[in-house]
Amino acid sequence: MTPKDAVMQYHMAERAKLDIMMLAHQLTTVPTLKKEDKPGAKFVLTELLSVLRADMEGAESVTGRAEFGKAAEGIDEVLSLVSTNQFGIASDKCGEAMIPVTSVAADAFSVLSAEKLI
């Protein structure tokens, strides 16, 4: 991996990790909302998860790293759980979707560190 590729992969992976963590946290708050607020929250989170899935698919296409595709598959599972109002389990599945993305970040960090860029 070239340093240029490492920078791109590191950036994409770290951004994905932050997005996944944010959405996982938001999913845990849905059960605490008022009944009339839950459908709107569910809609917004579903849309954000769909955007995240598309970002992961795009990252896989740009970088060639299958780990981003695995993360997209994990987000698909999260979307299925959200559709059946299983927000707690969906939040846990977000954590699982973050594992392959973390591997990309670690690999890229190793290259950047070896090149003394970090």
For the regions a language model picked out, list residue spans one by one.
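Long, charged/polar, soluble alpha-helical segments
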Residues: 1-118
